[in-house]
Curated annotation (Swiss-Prot):
Residues 639-648 have a biased composition (Basic residues). Binds 1 Zn(2+) per monomer. This is ATP-dependent DNA helicase Q1. It catalyses: Couples ATP hydrolysis with the unwinding of duplex DNA by translocating in the 3'-5' direction; ATP + H2O = ADP + phosphate + H(+); dATP + H2O = dADP + phosphate + H(+). The modification Phosphoserine is found at residues 597, 633. Keywords: Acetylation, ATP-binding, DNA-binding, Helicase, Hydrolase, Isomerase, Metal-binding, Nucleotide-binding, Nucleus, Phosphoprotein, Zinc. GO terms for molecular function: 3'-5' DNA helicase activity; ATP binding; ATP hydrolysis activity; DNA/DNA annealing activity; double-stranded DNA helicase activity; metal ion binding. Zn(2+) binds at residues 453, 471, 475, 478. ATP binds at residues 113-120. Its EC number is 5.6.2.4. Residues 100-275 form the Helicase ATP-binding domain. Gene3D superfamilies: P-loop containing nucleotide triphosphate hydrolases, Winged helix-like DNA-binding domain superfamily/Winged helix DNA-binding domain.
Length: 648
């Protein structure tokens, strides 16, 4: 009869195998769920495309851009005359003529066009070719000021109404709205004016009845949708325009809306049949680059000053910052070093914002250091650089902000400084937003990627297929003349989980910085875990691993709300249980270390091949010393050369 100890040993073996099977089942279940979700998305898209195709086939409304790219419409002569003699342009950009023709035909349209593609002309030119005026809804005062400044230079009669408009000005605009002899062609308002001013709506009704309101243009139309990156509640009230003024054409414009957002916007604006024209997201003249953010403020400022005084000497640019405080401090630092810089943020007085905007537009200031308030609609053509002092809170925001560079179609640079701490600063700010954290993590994933073409990453986000070869080496990743490999970081992730579990047992919460300190053997001794050896890697590499573990859900954020701040802590994530399975692997793609010679590189390649084929450790004098280094994925070689996990 078997001894109790033997039975116990077998029982433990069975229990261990069952546990491994449970983990595999969980992994398969998670994968199944991912595939089901993807299946649902694809099925929905196919259904939507079929419905759209059916609707197009049964409708007399020709929805293809090619059908509107014609010069035989009765209004074309006037359109061409205004283009050349008023706007001083000789030809249209892609989709401009098509959109203008649709608007002149009094059809509703949504236009998705990249920043700098010339969206404004699509409603400004038809306004000049029509009787009456066009109402333009914009989310920001700076946007309206910029548009009006350009229109004034062109001799076009346009104005705006906002909270700071004088009574005399409001009275004059209201009178012009119903005056049949008025030359006023464009009236800019914020969405709040539509949502909250009964007097203005009353005047709009009278203008519509008199045949004076010919159309409305909703700029940054993605703001209508709570699924958009910049949702604004007052935009939801804009559905009143189509209900009250059904015969006035409506145009929605955006640079960043996905198909899902556009469908939502269409419902919110009460638009039935409409055309949707989408231009390619690609701006071929923009160079995209992600840089590691220097750890000290002094080094960071010095890095930016070298760029401005070197590569961008005498050239115009924008620096985007996370907070108003950052923008003010950086402006002061730049000014002390002789850079002509000005601050721009939402809490400045209107006249101060206008002054900075005007000085920058006239090249009296070289750089505007701004928050997102210096945003939508900024239309200076010769911006040669846009630097992000911190990453944006979403890919949509980044695409729009970086797109303010190079609107003259000459080369311009979009440089983003990526810092680990910024993830959690921004996360604490967007935690209350509907999909704020999800969108932030998409941005972090973009920054973490060291190998894939930046344009491919942007295209994937906006539901567009892009061939990396067409980038023409206009991004940092496509310019790299290096090879990449997958590094196994599974043990590092296991160590992080051990540290977090011990802290939880001690009723301690760990911020991301405290977690890394504990991992490196620094900070409070009680937070260190026996058996967890401090990795022999630079701190920025450890930060990348933590960020990767967060994106892959081995870690998760937890928030604590105080009277003065929202604090982000890290906890064990939903996928951490998978790490207890020895077969489970977590990998990161990193740049291969430079080899001293081709011979050395070939030798190392042969070593890796031997490890992969034999599946056993190779002898090495450095075996013990390099255990904490990242190993190539799938390799058990503990004696591989020490390598630094390289960022771009």
């Amino acid at each position: 009869m078997a001894s109790v100890s033997a039975l116990t040993e077998e029982l433990e073996s069975v229990a261990s195998e069952l546990h491994a099977i449970d983990i595999q089942i969980q992994e398969l279940t998670e994968r199944r769920q991912e595939l089901l979700q993807r299946k649902s998305v694809l099925t929905g898209k196919i259904k939507q495309y079929l419905e759209d195709s059916s609707a197009e086939a049964s409708s007399d409304l020709d929805t293809s851009p090619a059908a509107w790219n014609k010069e035989d419409f009765p209004w074309f002569g006037k359109v061409k005359d205004v283009l050349q003699n008023v706007f001083k342009l000789q030809k249209f950009r892609p989709l401009q003529l098509e959109t203008i023709n649709v608007t002149m035909a009094r059809k509703d349209i949504f236009l998705v066009m990249p920043t700098g593609g010339g969206k404004s002309l699509c409603y400004q030119l038809p306004a000049l070719c029509s009787d009456g005026f066009t109402l333009v809804i914009c989310p920001l005062i700076s946007l309206m000021e910029d548009q009006l400044m350009v229109l004034k230079q062109l001799g076009i009669s346009a104005t705006m109404l906002n909270a700071s408009s004088s009574k005399e000005h409001v009275k004059w605009v209201h009178a012009e709205m119903v005056n049949k002899n008025s030359q006023l062609k464009l009236i800019y308002v914020t969405p709040e004016k539509i949502a909250k001013s009964k007097m203005f709506m009353s005047r709009l009704e009278k203008a519509y009845e008199a045949g004076r309101l010919t159309g409305a243009a909703v700029d940054e139309v993605h703001c209508c949708s709570q699924w958009g990156h910049d949702f604004r509640p007052d935009y939801k009230a804009l559905g009143i325009l189509k209900r009250q003024f059904p015969n006035a054409s409506l145009m929605g414009l955006t640079a960043t809306a996905t198909n899902h957002v556009l469908k939502d916007v269409q419902k919110i604006l009460c638009v039935g049949k409409c055309l949707t024209f989408t231009a390619s997201f690609n701006r071929p003249n923009l160079f995209y680059e992600v840089r590691q953010k220097p750890s000290s403020a002094e080094d960071f400022t010095e890095d930016i000053v070298k760029l401005i005084n070197g590569r961008y000497k005498g050239q115009s640019g924008i620096i985007y910052c996370f907070s108003q405080k950052d923008s003010e401090q950086i402006t002061i630092s730049l000014q002390k070093l002789g850079i002509h810089a000005g601050t721009y943020h939402a809490n400045m007085e209107p006249e101060d914002k206008t002054k900075v905007h005007t000085q920058w537009s006239a090249n009296e200031l070289q750089v505007v250091v701004a928050t997102v308030a210096f945003g939508m609609g900024i239309d200076k053509p010769d911006v040669r650089f846009v630097i992000h002092h911190s990453m944006s809170k979403s890919m949509e925001n980044y695409y729009q902000e970086s797109g303010r560079a190079g609107r003259d179609d000459s080369r311009a640079d979009c440089i983003l400084y990526y810092g680990f701490g910024d993830i959690f600063r921004i996360s604490s700010m967007v935690v209350m937003e509907n999909v704020g954290q999800q969108k932030l993590y998409e941005m972090v994933s973009y920054c973490q990627n060291v190998s894939k073409c930046r344009r491919v990453l942007i295209a994937q986000h906006f539901d567009e297929v892009w061939n990396a070869d067409a980038c023409n080496k206009m991004c940092d990743n496509c310019c790299k003349d290096v090879s990449f490999e997958k590094k196994n970081v599974t043990q590092h992730c296991r160590d992080l989980i051990k540290i977090l579990k011990q802290a939880e047992g001690l009723n301690e919460k760990l911020t991301p910085l405290k977690l890394i300190d504990a991992w490196m053997g620094k900070g409070a001794a009680k937070l260190r875990v026996a058996g967890v050896v401090a990795p022999a890697l630079p701190r920025e590499d450890l930060e990348r691993i933590v960020a990767h573990a967060l994106l892959q859900q081995y870690l998760k954020e937890d928030y604590s709300f105080t009277a003065y701040a929202t604090i982000s802590y890290l906890k064990v994530g939903p996928r951490a249980c998978l790490l207890s399975n020895e077969a489970h692997a977590v990998t990161m793609q990193v740049k291969k270390s430079a080899q001293s010679s081709v011979r050395g590189a070939l030798s190392e390649a042969r070593q890796v091949e031997q490890v992969d084929s034999k599946g056993e450790e190779q002898s090495s004098g450095n075996s013990q010393k390099s255990k904490s280094r990242l190993q190539p994925s799938g390799s058990k070689n503990a004696g591989a050369k020490k390598r630094k996990l390289d960022d771009a």
